[in-house]
């Protein structure tokens, strides 16, 4: 088994990553940053997003696992205080995993060229200055002309992030779907949008045709300048992300811990 360790630059994360490397070497586990079987993310959910994007081309063959150096996150099952227990689970790994849906984003340029990207969390299209105007198509048909600050499209696991702040629903990751939410849409007697989040199944895609070239496309922690882009397509990817599952942490428990806390 080959392990890659991806950590943020916070002092505590660096210390934990060094301890983990020493533990792996002590147990004769190979450290391989190029072709790992398991990628260990040391940090928070943002760090795991960075790890996913680094190894996105190996999505089908690697498993991720998060070691959190703060509070328990949505993508991290282990706390840094549980390092010894985590190491024991890692060295006795037998391939156990759980998989979740990914978002496939296709960017079409004016030249006709298209580029595909994968997102674990979400993709956000925003207009830095002024109003974003874009035609939205669903099921191959024109649905609405959006006017506002932007659009967010999230995976089920990403539904607890920006999507939730936009008033979107929290989706269980067992559902193969994506969700579109509006960011500060303009609704009056002249301009109208649906004004509510949309949940789209895996056999359909969302198509967005912006009316300007001055917008930003962000997916996870990556960014694409919105120059010479004529179309953006969003759908559930045929690929899935795989996490090493050494213990079960219920999704709704994660949601409760993050937003509600314990019920008395």
Curated annotation (Swiss-Prot):
Residues at the active site: 45
Entry's localization field: Cytoplasm
Binding-site list for NAD(+): 45-46, 121-122, 147, 149, 184, 221
Organism, scientific name: Leuconostoc mesenteroides subsp. mesenteroides (strain ATCC 8293 / DSM 20343 / BCRC 11652 / CCM 1803 / JCM 6124 / NCDO 523 / NBRC 100496 / NCIMB 8023 / NCTC 12954 / NRRL B-1118 / 37Y)
InterPro entries xref list: ATP-NAD_kinase_N, ATP-NAD_kinase_PpnK-typ_C, NAD/diacylglycerol_kinase_sf, NADK
Gene3D superfamilies per the UniProt record, alphabetical: Probable inorganic polyphosphate/atp-NAD kinase, domain 1, Probable inorganic polyphosphate/atp-NAD kinase, domain 2
Enzyme Commission number(s): 2.7.1.23
Record field: catalytic activity: NAD(+) + ATP = ADP + NADP(+) + H(+)
Function: Involved in the regulation of the intracellular balance of NAD and NADP, and is a key enzyme in the biosynthesis of NADP. Catalyzes specifically the phosphorylation on 2'-hydroxyl of the adenosine moiety of NAD to yield NADP.
GO molecular function: ATP binding; metal ion binding; NAD binding; NAD+ kinase activity
Keyword vocabulary terms for this entry: ATP-binding, Cytoplasm, Kinase, NAD, NADP, Nucleotide-binding, Transferase
The protein's required cofactors: a divalent metal cation
A Gene Ontology term for the protein's cellular component: cytoplasm
Gene Ontology biological-process annotations: NAD metabolic process; NADP biosynthetic process
Keyword Aminoacyl-tRNA synthetase: no
Record family assignment: Belongs to the NAD kinase family.
Keyword Kinase: yes
Pfam families: NAD_kinase, NAD_kinase_C
Protein name: NAD kinase
